[in-house]
Swiss-Prot record:
Official protein name in the record: E2F transcription factor-like E2FF
SUPFAM superfamilies in alphabetical order: Winged helix' DNA-binding domain
Function per UniProt: Inhibitor of E2F-dependent activation of gene expression. Binds specifically the E2 recognition site without interacting with DP proteins and prevents transcription activation by E2F/DP heterodimers. Does not bind retinoblastoma-related proteins. Acts as a growth regulator but is not associated with changes in the expression of cell cycle marker genes or in nuclear ploidy levels. Has no effect on cell proliferation, but may repress cell wall biosynthesis genes during cell elongation in differentiated cells.
One cellular component term from this protein's GO annotations in UniProt: nucleus
Region of interest (Disordered), residue spans: 104-143
GO MF term (any one): DNA-binding transcription factor activity
Family classification: Belongs to the E2F/DP family.
Bias-annotated ranges (Polar residues): 108-117
Length: 354
DNA sequence: CCCTCCCGCCAATGC
DNA sequence: GCATTGGCGGGAGGG
């Protein structure tokens, strides 16, 4: 009778709604999004559908897909429509980004171009490209808008990790580096605001991890393509846990932020802060349960037809083996291995539980 | 108090 | 014209 869950349920049954900022975070949204669409039978993603399924405003879906697209997990297919590419695309994307980033860093071979931070178009140009010869690449001002897009910002953010030699990056430093213009003032703040969103998303996928700079306690992020630490994830399946399981409610129909109401109410009700939360260093010494994000492959949730899940797994494994030899890229292969490992472990666990 | 960042207004852009 | 996209920053939540 003291668990946060119980309390919140009571509150709900009383007709009261609880607002929790955390449950509304982009990170959680993305987790749900991925859990929802990481299936074998998923190909197209409708924006309206997504918004409905996840119980959020349309606007938020744009944030999600824009960021995910920067890593190649989804791709724009058309109006109101994205297609699911899957985690298998990540290595490729990262590889490209790295190469691109390196080139920009010390590649003065080509003629053109300011030293603005990239703009190397990646995004599928609308098929109606002008019969413009030359490898070229734009130039005009048309893409000054694009320069501020979340999509590009996200790409440049990961480029920083992939190319830079220091593995701890502060949002401020990132913002500064990715600003290229107007060194100070409001632009910084805005940029940082955006970076918070991006960082949260990547963090929720365990692509990066939030830490602190050694001596200064300034928060910073570290890239962990592969060596992601084990923790949680399987907890999704351990039934009857007092823990607040991570996305038990795909449909996020929680109260709105509503000015001035809820916070006080919540306190009166006796809302206790989530116990659990950061299981940071759960003492799980040797148990190397790799987890890619707080979500798990859905195909297997209804085990018995391991066709579904296996298909995905094999697909990844195949990719891993074909991909490894050609590119000797630590980051990438590590990442893939990590994925494969995660899936294997997960399926094993499910089978046992069954 | 400062840091984090959700929310949704409304401007571009597309059709 | 309306519909889609998505910058942008006010100001609420959380430490």
């Amino acid at each position: 009778m003291s668990s946060a869950i119980v309390v919140s349920q009571d509150a709900e049954s009383l007709g009261l709604q609880i607002y929790s900022r955390k449950e509304k975070s982009l990170g959680v949204l993305v987790s749900n999004f991925l859990r929802l669409y990481n299936r074998d039978d998923v190909d197209l993603i409708g924006l309206d559908d997504a918004a409905g399924q996840l119980g959020v405003e349309r606007r938020r879906i744009y944030d999600v897909v824009n960021i995910l697209e920067s890593i190649g997990i989804v791709a724009r297919r058309g109006k109101n429509q994205y297609s699911w590419k899957g985690f298998g695309e990540i290595p490729r994307s990262l590889d490209e980004l790295k190469e691109e980033g390196m080139r920009e860093r010390l590649g003065y071979s080509s003629s053109n171009n300011s030293d603005k931070v990239s703009n190397g178009c990646e995004r599928e140009e609308p098929l109606t490209l002008t019969p413009d010869d030359q490898e070229n690449s734009s130039s005009s001002k048309m893409d000054q808008k694009k320069e501020k897009s979340l999509w590009l910002l996200a790409q440049n953010f990961v480029k920083m990790f992939l190319c830079s030699d220091d593995d701890l990056i502060t949002l401020d430093s990132a913002a500064k580096a990715l600003l290229s213009d107007s060194p100070d003032s409001v632009h910084m703040r805005t940029k940082v605001r955006r970076l918070y969103d991006i960082a949260n998303v990547f963090a929720s996928m365990n692509l990066i991890e939030k830490t602190h700079i050694p001596v200064t306690r300034k928060p910073a992020y570290r890239w962990l393509g592969s060596k992601s630490i084990a923790e949680r994830g399987l907890s999704l399946f351990n039934s009857g846990e007092p823990k607040r399981v991570f996305g038990t409610e795909i449909t996020n129909l929680r109260a709105k932020r509503n000015k001035t109401y809820c916070s006080s109410i919540r306190k009166q009700i006796g809302y206790k802060k989530h116990d659990e939360e950061n299981t940071e260093q759960e003492s799980k010494p040797a148990a190397s349960k790799y987890v890619f994000g707080p979500f798990s492959p859905i195909g297997a949730s209804k085990t018995n037809n391991d066709k579904v899940g296996k298909g995905r797994l094999l697909e990844i494994e195949a990719l891993a083996s074909t991909y490894q030899p050609q590119y000797c890229n630590q980051e990438i292969t590590g990442l893939l291995g990590h994925f494969t490992e995660a899936w294997k472990k997960w399926y094993a666990e499910v089978d046992r539980n069954k």
